[in-house]
Design a protein with these regions (language model features):
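Cell-wall glycan-active module
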Residues: 1-156, 160-176, 211-212, 227-231, ...
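Short acidic, low-complexity segments enriched in Ser/Thr/Gly/Pro
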Residues: 212-215, 219-222
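N-terminal cap/lid subdomain of alpha/beta-hydrolase-fold enzymes
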Residues: 176-185
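Extracellular/periplasmic catalytic domains that process cell-envelope and extracellular macromolecules
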Residues: 150-154, 186-189, 262-267, 287-289
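Substrate-binding/active-site groove segments that recognize
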Residues: 48, 184-208
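Active-site rim elements
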Residues: 254-262, 297
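Generic, ordered loop/turn and secondary-structure boundary motif
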Residues: 170, 189, 194-197, 261, ...
Length: 325
């Protein structure tokens, strides 16, 4: 009896300077999810196909609560202290002296929980349209070209960090109680595949998208956000005009920010923009997960998970086949 899921189709090609197809991406994400957060779970009759269960078992009230055991490649159900009956046949199974059937388990994993779904979790902010693998692949390919995330190792590190940041590609919005600690407050909490946070980062990305230069007006002190800066200079006659311009644009930025959690284009593009802006391509080239994580997260929060996800993205993308290694 197999206690693992049927293996998904694996890819053997190198992804350097190559677009993902929808099938490529689905296969990679499925493989990663199958290997993520796996724990063995006992199986019960309630989760077994009813038409495969012998009527012998169904005559008992609450028969679905019975755990399933395995003995010599046969699934069996225990009655009393020592009696076991075949799950499929309902006939008694003779257990040899000194032997004991064991619980039948299946691995629960991220794939068991999420399947092939993408960014489907019901959060305060979610994608306005259901996401397909075709669209997700298109957006990733465009971002990879635009921001030079163009080799296997760069893409592996990028996707592994995104996988953690988005809770396994289920949401592009940070549901958290710590939002008050971000500069600018809850309007500027984490959004996107790599969670963009703080008002000054949103302003910088707004400038990048709209080809504006409002961030140059923000001459901050250490630890000071844009909103804090506006408050500080509002009474300064020489900076009053700057304060007014920043105040007006930050209202636009506040409205724009939600695009990063509701529109997959901005969710992907903002992450890739952040990646290149912070020279993460060059860091990823060194294959140093810790260094990448510190740059993304500002510390080592979740480092063991980031290391593990990087490892399994390498396996899923068959990094051993990479032509640029």
């Amino acid at each position: 009896l197999k206690n693992i899921m049927e293996p998904s189709t694996k890819t053997t090609k190198c992804f350097c300077h190559t677009d993902f197809t929808a099938d490529d991406l689905r296969s990679i994400i499925r493989t990663v999810r199958e290997k993520s957060n796996t724990v063995p779970q006992k199986q019960f009759l309630s989760s077994y196909p009813s038409d495969k269960i012998a009527n012998f078992h169904k005559k008992y009230a609450n028969y679905g609560a019975n755990p399933i055991y395995t003995y010599k490649n046969e699934l069996v159900i225990k009655y009393g202290a020592t009696d076991y009956y075949s799950l499929a046949k309902g006939t008694k199974v003779n257990v040899a002296q000194g032997e004991t059937p064991v619980f039948w388990t299946k691995n629960k994993s991220d794939y068991t929980v999420y399947g092939d779904n993408l960014f489907h979790n019901n959060t305060n902010e979610k994608l306005l349209r259901p996401l397909t693998y075709e669209v997700f692949a298109k957006e990733l390919n465009e971002a990879f070209r635009k921001y030079e995330i163009n080799t296997c190792v760069r893409r592996i590190h990028f996707l592994a960090q995104c996988y953690l940041e988005t809770w396994r590609f289920t949401k592009a919005y940070e549901d958290t109680t710590k939002a008050a600690g971000y500069k600018g407050g809850a309007d500027f909490l984490g959004r996107g595949l790599i969670h963009l946070t703080n008002d000054y980062n949103y302003l910088a990305y707004y400038d990048a998208v709209n080809a504006t230069t409002y961030a140059k007006l923000y001459k901050n002190r250490i630890g000071e956000g844009v909103i804090d800066y506006i408050r500080r200079i509002s009474g300064d006659a020489t900076l009053k005009a700057d304060a007014q311009k920043l105040l007006e644009v930050m209202e636009k930025v506040r409205a724009f920010a939600k695009n990063l959690s509701t529109d997959i284009h901005y969710a992907v593009d903002s992450a890739a923009w952040f990646w290149k802006k912070n020279k993460l391509n060059e860091i990823a080239d060194t294959d140093d997960v810790r260094a990448v994580s510190v740059k993304v997260n500002g510390g080592t929060n979740g480092l063991p998970e980031r290391e593990y996800y990087t490892k399994i993205f390498k396996e899923a993308m068959r990094y051993n086949n990479c032509k640029s290694k």
